Amino acid sequence: MSRLRRFNRKILSLSSDYTHDGESDQEDVSILPLDTEEQEELIQKFETNAHITNKLYINLLSILYLLYGGLLMILVRKSRGYIKLALLAGANSLICSCITLRYDIVNDYLLFKKFKLRVSNFSINIINIILLVLMAWISFNHVVEDKKTVLCLQVPMFLFWVAVLVKRWARNIEDEIADLRCLKYKYKNA
């Protein structure tokens, strides 16, 4: 068990005193392989560490989405015409980005007991892209009128791509941990 703790400390800490090139002291990781229980403990540690980190990033991004969405709603009250429509599209785009970032959605809804409406992250992303295109089209057509607002309207596009990248990054980490579980070997210490 102490060997596992030393191994975990070496891997998980970002200390600069990690020894390389044959330098050894008593705290170095043993060259003996980890047994199956130690492997499972280490993989579970990686999994919980990744889950906590993902949750932190998603919560921080959600707060950022809510704050910027509130700012856009304040700007909606002060603006007129087409810019108001673009700001509303930007606020709705932020809502869609936040929903797809936080949740994995696959729901079926019955409309008027005849039509079946399937709502998933893919369909929310399609709506989000339509809103972003509408917002960009309006903002670039009226760039002469209000340049500050046009710059504010570029942030929802950036935050959409951030949400997509964070979601993909979280899925990649989950896949890597699943691959790590498949690579476990059978070894028992005496």
UniProtKB/Swiss-Prot annotation:
Signal peptide: none annotated. Its main location: membrane. It is found in: Membrane. Coiled coil: none annotated. InterPro entries: UCP010056 (IPR016564). Present with 238 molecules/cell in log phase SD medium. The keyword Transmembrane helix applies. Residues 1-55, 102-123, 171-190 are cytoplasmic. It is a multi-pass membrane protein. Residues 77-80, 145-149 are extracellular. PANTHER family: HISTONE-LYSINE N-METHYLTRANSFERASE. GO terms for cellular component: endoplasmic reticulum; membrane. This is Uncharacterized membrane protein YGR016W. Keywords: Membrane, Transmembrane, Transmembrane helix. The chain crosses the membrane at residues 56-76, 81-101, 124-144, 150-170.
